[in-house]
Design a protein with these regions (language model features):
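Short, acidic/turn-prone active-site loops that include or flank metal/cofactor-
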Residues: 109-110, 131-135
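Generic structural signal for helix capping and beta-alpha/helix-loop junctions
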Residues: 52, 85, 113, 136, ...
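Residues that line or immediately flank small-molecule/substrate-binding pockets and catalytic motifs
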Residues: 49, 80, 131, 199, ...
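Conserved alpha-helical substructure of the radical SAM core
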Residues: 2-118, 122-123, 324-325, 329-333
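Radical SAM enzyme [4Fe-4S]-AdoMet core and its adjacent flexible, acidic
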Residues: 59-60, 99, 123, 128-132, ...
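Accessory C-terminal segments flanking Radical SAM cores
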Residues: 226-333
């Protein structure tokens, strides 16, 4: 499926303006981690473990505004931890919308029904709900029975209230294809606006029992494509080809920048070598050439959209790529 036209136009205008201004590294997405506190303890979440000692810290509305102004990205992904635990999350969403941002609020949706009335529907605002499989699979990974049904109820309430809703699903080594198909069918029947997939990534060198190597990702995504196609998937066709091993893409670690109570996360959304005090320090003082597959061993199996979707625009060198993206945007692919 294609992204909404207004979102693609917002991103395209931003990229064009940045290129005309001679900016070499143009982040497209700001991951704004309001807090690392969470009401779940999911097996695959690196954030709540990495920031275990600072979970009580949270960004203020002013800090969030300043980060959005500094990063100057067209898209802001408000996350955590669980952002619906933050008392000012609705005000932060409104601040982002008033700045012209496309906003995704990433949530496990356990508090979505409770806090839904604090938000107003907007064509640039989406709740992005994390679901890793049908009820039995999702509840096992979250460690709390009933989480799937509570999240589903939150999605249903948000859709009925007129909000945009997307989902994000992490695929682990032991995730059966049938469970993903079951989940996708349920979400499609429910009427979500799009579904994202993310291969499970090891945060340190090598993989553990749950994460996937690059060949395993390609095999899984080929099987998913054969069984499901690209129905309702919220990714560009070029990125999906990359996941299936059908094309190469370079990682753009600066394409998605992350700000949280510790500062600007260096170098990227997944890896943490340091936190720096300013966006300028992140962009100008990071040795970007040192990161990515073939450069840093930790990056060898990473295929996450945070680094590779932003490179799609830069990777379109042929007329066929441009035509394929145009067909996708018009709903023809």
């Amino acid at each position: 499926m294609s992204l909404p036209l207004n979102i693609n136009l917002t991103i395209a205008r931003h990229v064009l303006a940045e290129r005309l201004n001679g900016h070499q590294r143009t982040p497209l997405v700001l991951m704004l981690e309001l807090t690392h506190a969470c009401n779940l303890n999911c097996a695959g979440c690196g954030r709540i473990r990495e920031y275990a000692d600072t979970r009580a810290a949270r960004l203020t509305l002013q800090q969030a505004r300043q980060a959005m102004q500094a990063a100057h990205t067209p898209v802001v992904s408000i996350s955590g931890g669980e952002p619906l635990l933050h008392p000012d999350v609705a005000d932060i969403v409104q601040a982002a919308l008033s700045m012209g941002k496309v906003v995704y609020l990433c949530t496990n949706a356990l508090l979505l029904e409770k806090r839904l009335a604090e938000f107003e529907p907007h064509r640039r605002f989406y709740f992005n709900v994390h679901l890793d499989g049908p009820p039995a699979v999702h509840d096992r990974l979250t460690g709390l029975p009933g989480t799937y049904q509570r999240a589903r109820a939150g999605i249903s309430a948000a859709l009925e209230a007129g909000f945009g809703v997307t989902t994000n699903t992490t695929i682990y080594k032991d995730t059966p294809l049938e469970s993903i198909l079951h989940l996708f069918q349920d979400l499609t029947d429910l009427g979500v606006d799009g579904m994202m997939v993310a291969p499970a990534f090891a945060y340190e060198v090598g993989t553990n029992a749950a994460t996937l190597t690059r060949p395993e990702v390609e095999q899984r995504m080929q099987a998913l494509y054969q069984a499901w196609g690209d129905r309702n998937l919220y990714h560009s066709p070029l990125y999906m080809q990359f996941l299936r091993g059908e094309r190469a893409l370079d990682c753009m670690p600066w394409g998605t920048v992350t700000y949280n109570p510790q500062g600007w996360k260096q170098p990227c959304y997944l890896l943490t070598d340091a936190h720096v005090p300013s966006f300028e320090a992140l962009i100008n003082n990071t040795n970007w050439e040192a990161y990515g597959p073939g450069r840093d061993a930790r990056c060898a199996d990473c295929m996450l959209h945070s680094g590779f979707e932003p490179s799609v625009m830069n990777g379109m060198h042929s007329l066929s790529d441009w035509l394929q993206m145009a067909r996708w945007q018009l709903g023809g692919e």
